[in-house]
Amino acid sequence: MILLLLACKKDRFLNSSDARVRVSDDTLHFDTVFVTAGSTYRAFTVANDYDQKLLLTSVRLGGGNTSPFKLNLNGQIGYAFNSIVLDKKDSLYGWIQVNIDPNNQNTPFVVRDSVIIELNGKTQKIQLEAWGRNAYFLRNARISQSQTWSNDKPYVI
């Protein structure tokens, strides 16, 4: 019976306001994402270098559910995750994807947001930046004769 009581120990989290996580990237860039097509995923890690567990208050997108970016954290997709336990000397993986809505611009444009990590009352950010581009999409199109295309936007065939 004594062994059982000694084997149980309450989880203790590092609660210092000086504690920080180590992130793999300060900025994730997406280059030339055609509107409505979506991007590939960009990965990042959040690491706990301490000998104690960390309790992340939240990991979320700054733009919330209106963000063009999507957050996948340890296999779960969403805009915000709360009360995440990060074991000592452990890390978690995150992936970001962006899907940019069309607009009236014929030139490339940029959309931005950030991943906000809250720990012990402090925040850290990973900046997100994607260059969007409107385009003409030719899906299942058949060209049977000579055509002249305008050069105001790229064509995605």
Residue ranges and their predicted role:
Residues 9-32, 38-40, 49-97, 102:
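Surface-exposed binding patches on compact interaction domains or structured appendages
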Residues 9-12, 101-134:
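Terminal connector regions
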Residues 4-7:
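C-terminal motif of bacterial Sec signal peptides marking the signal peptidase cleavage site
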Residues 58-60, 98, 121, 132, ...:
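A mature extracytoplasmic/lumenal domain signature
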Residues 41-49, 96, 111-118:
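Buried hydrophobic-core signal for structured, non-transmembrane domains
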Residues 155-157:
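Beta-strand-rich extracellular passenger or scaffold domains
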Residues 126-153:
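Low-complexity, Pro/Ser/Thr- and charge-rich linker/hinge segments at domain boundaries
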